[in-house]
Amino acid sequence: MKGIRERVYHAWKTGTYPSPATKTLGIKILELSEGHSLVEMEVDEHLHNMSSTMHGGVMADIADAAMGIAISTTISPEEDFTTMEMKISFFRPHIKGPLRAEGIVAKRGRRVAFAEAVLTNQNKEIVAKANGTWLFLTG
């Protein structure tokens, strides 16, 4: 789907959601600049696993969103992209309240990009870190 960069900037400016997945999870864009994003979601019991902590897959989702949104600031209108691979390391559980993810483009090439995300809780403690690789699609 073309025009991703424009849709992401529009979502940030209007306080709307850039994709159905981010809308479902309530992920909002707080900051956006070239190669950088800061997103946030509110966590409560409906996002918990059987241990009554935030489900790791949902943490991976906000990390993927932060990195993908950061990458979207670097693409041309003719480009699209997709996640090739992603790794996440969990440092502490998150139970309730806001969770932020900062996405940073570490390296942007012609065909692939590498990005990182740091997830923090309301006390600014690191909850998880992620990194991944994205493939650019053209024509």
Where are the predicted features?
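Terminal targeting signals and extreme-terminal segments of soluble enzymes
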Residues: M1-G139
